[in-house]
UniProtKB/Swiss-Prot annotation:
Record HAMAP family: Ribosomal_uL23_B (MF_01369_B)
Name under which the protein is recorded: Large ribosomal subunit protein uL23
Coiled-coil features, chain-numbered ranges: none
Domain of life: Bacteria
Lineage: Bacteria, Pseudomonadati, Thermodesulfobacteriota, Desulfuromonadia, Geobacterales
InterPro entries: Nucleotide-bd_a/b_plait_sf (IPR012677), Ribosomal_uL23-like (IPR013025), Ribosomal_uL23/eL15/eS24_sf (IPR012678), Ribosomal_uL23_CS (IPR001014)
Keyword terms of this UniProt record: Ribonucleoprotein, Ribosomal protein, RNA-binding, rRNA-binding
Gene Ontology CC terms, in alphabetical order: ribonucleoprotein complex; ribosome
Entry keyword annotation includes Zinc-finger: no
Length: 94
């Protein structure tokens, strides 16, 4: 898989910002068919950082209703990337 199609976007929330500051863990929304090795290589190449570990979570889409119509949001995959000591990604800085 192409490294530019592995990572879709960073996941920036209050919780992920705290994780970044306290434990040096950054979060990404990644392609559903990407594995941990591809995610690790993509983060290393795109951001020039050393990766310690990668954890992934498959997030199930919620069932939503608008009036009589029932639909389902898409499933997606989230990756928690732990960086080695001294590594930093700049887009999380304000």
């Amino acid at each position: 898989m192409n490294i530019y199609s592995v990572i879709k976007k960073p996941l920036i929330t209050e919780k992920t910002t705290i994780e970044k500051d306290e434990r040096n863990i950054i979060s990404f929304v990644v392609s559903s068919d990407a594995n941990k090795i591809e995610i690790k290589d993509a983060v290393k190449t795109l951001f020039n950082v050393d990766v310690a570990s990668v954890k992934t979570v498959n997030v199930a889409g919620k069932v939503k209703r608008v009036g009589k119509n029932i639909g389902k949001r898409s499933n997606w995959k989230k990756a928690y990337v732990t960086l080695k000591e001294g590594s930093n990604v700049d887009f999380f800085e304000a």
